[in-house]
Amino acid sequence: MEKLEIAFEPMLGDDVRQHVMEGLHAFNYVATGQDEHYPANFTLRGEAGDVLGGLLGYVWGRWLHVTYLWLAEPARGGGYGSRLIGQAEAYARKRGAVGSTLETYSFQARPFYESLGYQVCGQIDDYPPGHTKFILKKALA
């Protein structure tokens, strides 16, 4: 076998990131038969086009996974977070998703997600120290 090296690369190039993701998707397809992977990214922009928030996620295996949801301070409390989630869920339903999953922390938005029908299905205590990480899910079908 050829000699292999592990390299720390804090700034991966897009080509390397894409190669790793494609390898994982191929592996997952063999194991699950699920090949369809849809990006589910939505932005909230001001009149000048500046980004005031966004939701980054994807649909795979008939589930929406919300990876990130963020709103700039001036956009919070105006219903935009709910609208971003709603748009992502509608997009996912059109692609056959039956559920949605996301993660949040005790210092972030658990009550917000619960108000939208998400339920805690797992947690990791003391991550980061003094806080809790929550895994939530919601049925979409």
Q: Where are the model-predicted features located?
A:
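Conserved N-terminal entry element of GNAT/NAT acetyltransferase domains
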Residues: 1-12
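Conserved active-site tyrosine of GNAT-family acetyltransferases
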Residues: 20, 113, 118
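A conserved beta-strand-loop-helix scaffold within acyl/acetyltransferase catalytic domains
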Residues: 35, 46-47, 55-64, 69
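Short hydrophobic/aromatic beta-strand element in the GNAT-like acyltransferase core
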Residues: 39-43, 54, 68, 133-135
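A conserved beta-turn-beta hairpin within the catalytic core of GNAT-like acetyltransferases
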Residues: 59-67, 76, 128-133
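Conserved acetyl-CoA pyrophosphate-binding loop and the N-cap/start of the following alpha-helix
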Residues: 75, 79-87
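Conserved GNAT acetyl-CoA-binding A-motif
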Residues: 92-105
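Conserved catalytic-core motifs of GNAT/GCN5-like acyltransferases
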Residues: 101-103, 119-135
